Amino acid sequence: MNKYEVIVVGAGHAGCEAALAAARMGCRTLVLSICLDTVAHMPCSPSVGGVGKGHLVREIDALGGRMALITDRTAIQFRLLNTKKGPAVWGTRTQNDKARYRISMKHCLESEPNLDLKQAHVESLAVEGNRIVGVIDQLGVFFGADAVVLATGTFLRGLVHIGTTSVEAGRAGELASYPLANQLQRLGFTLGRMKTGTPARLGRRSIDFSRFREQHGDEAPKPFSLFTDSIALPQVSCFIGKTHQRTHELVRRHIHLSPLYNGTIRGVSARYCPSLEDKVMRFPDKDFHQIILEPEGLDTEEVYASGTGNSLPYDIQLRLIHSVPGLEEAEVMRPAYAIEYDFVQPTQLKATLGSKLVEGLYMAGQINGTSGYEEAAGQGLWAGINAALKAQGRPPFILDRSEAYLAVMVDDLVTRGTNEPYRIFTSRAEYRLLLREDNADLRLLEKGCELGLHSADAAKELRERRGAIRNELERLRLTHVRPSAQVNQTLAENHSPPLDAPAPLDKLLKRPELNYSTVAILSPPPEPLSSKVTEQVEVECKYEGYLKRQEAEVAKFRQLEQAAIPEDLMYDDIPGLSNELRQKLGAVRPLSLGQATRIPGMTPAAVSVLMVHLRRRAQGGPFLAPVLDPGVNMHSQKKKLA
């Protein structure tokens, strides 16, 4: 039977999360992949997470996705980054066994009762009127669906470049998809062109590791997932080295052979993951660039040479690698390459990641102009949830920017669009003190439960933990410690000033040199508390003032977010708006005044005009007084229209 409620095209990180979400929400779901041997493949770095990206992984886990759990099962190194800064920008990063990750995720898909996994090369979408009804593969087989998620990665008109050699491919050795890209254009979608790449893979036995600095993982690794009880695999090291002036000279001398610099590649490169050619040419004064050797797994000789990505001819690549101290004898098992591919300008999508042009069509991952496994997985989960809700006739699932990094990413894409590969950063979030890795479950797990992506037991555990956090914060506030020789000795051992008067425990915990463990020595809780509780208590206590200030900012932000704009609003009928802004508003079709303020080029005056129009339109309905501040970050006069 070829009729499904949700079909997902592509089985990369976006496709896997989309399919699992839809299936677990009760939809009969089909995943179609060009090759079932590369489900959840990691075509570039053998790692997950990092600053910002780790936040996404935790949020995926909290909502009910599977990336965090599979990452923990297959991780061979854990590191918590940015620990010298505040907890808002801490980021977990893992090295992963690529083969085990792929196998584990595929097993997860195959074990899901509502989910079918098939190998097929989708060539076209079946559209009736302006509504999706299914897909058709290369063999002419039709698969019907109420909703379709496109998670095509780099396969739309993919073109791999190594020197003067260019090959049509979605990844090295895999078929590209040209008919589907052509059809998207015929349907009216605006496509752009982007470029990414991957470095060489080296043979482990051919590397002189003594010339590199060993980088160990954390001694007490903390998993990504709430549901991971222990770390399963042996932990290994990475190794840090650097390029040599010989390396840079080789790049400069042969730059005319790089497709990136001779005009062959027209796609826009990733700003935050530059190739070696870009680093050498853009930063000529730098004496060296960092190289990190990352193991690709426990059972393979392949080592990922991070920092050596380029698109130069193979013979030049060999010379580049051999110019690096410690890699003089290195065997190149796979050459570096660049890849160009098509993407759909994401302003053509709604906040659900559903298309504005074709009802029931959703898009997730690199097709939306993003880069990174984590960004793809997050969009896949978001799109899969909404595709399932669409198929079931239920209201859509949308978060706002104050609730999750996932929402920041989606809002950036659908409101502002992108002309270069988009990557998440903590700096993109206005309310990052509230959107920490450590509280992702407190923010989002209940929503995952409501969607049917978590069990009742998970919801019960969350309620109990939330209660324990609340009770301990209250105990710290009400319990006073009196000065004594023992108390002051404990404080002195932690380089903290002595007490000369009774002090509440929460005030002591606010001292930067003290942590919860020390305060608990002075006055232990009635019952032992889990680390999940005590870590949250410490953060909420130490940063209480900052958190309250940001919560007040969120309250202002939500005033604008709650001022809805009708989807059918005719912007051409609003006097006082420039033609440029009418076009932008008509293209994005913001759902709220808040979203309208974030459209590039939107001015405070234009927002005021829009507010006046909405207020007049709503005469007889609710008055829009709460939204007289035309934007949290636009510094306009709040009483201008009073």
Curated annotation (Swiss-Prot):
Residues binding NAD(+), per UniProt: 269-283
Gene3D superfamilies tied to this protein: FAD/NAD(P)-binding domain, GidA associated domain, C-terminal subdomain, tRNA uridine 5-carboxymethylaminomethyl modification enzyme MnmG/GidA
SUPFAM superfamilies: FAD/NAD(P)-binding domain
Binding site for FAD: G10, A11, G12, H13, A14, G15, V122, S177, Q366
GO BP: tRNA methylation; tRNA wobble uridine modification
Pfam families: GIDA, GIDA_C_1st, SAM_GIDA_C
Localization of this protein: Cytoplasm
Lineage top rank: taxon: Bacteria
One GO CC term, this protein: cytosol
Cofactor: FAD
GO terms of molecular function: flavin adenine dinucleotide binding
InterPro entries linked: FAD/NAD-bd_sf, GIDA_C_N, MnmG, MnmG-rel, MnmG-rel_CS, MnmG_C, MnmG_C_subdom, MnmG_C_subdom_sf
Swiss-Prot/TrEMBL keywords: Cytoplasm, FAD, Flavoprotein, NAD, tRNA processing
Quaternary assembly: Homodimer. Heterotetramer of two MnmE and two MnmG subunits.
Record function comment: NAD-binding protein involved in the addition of a carboxymethylaminomethyl (cmnm) group at the wobble position (U34) of certain tRNAs, forming tRNA-cmnm(5)s(2)U34.
HAMAP family: MnmG_GidA
Protein family (similarity comment): Belongs to the MnmG family.
Protein name in UniProt: tRNA uridine 5-carboxymethylaminomethyl modification enzyme MnmG
Organism: Syntrophobacter fumaroxidans (strain DSM 10017 / MPOB)
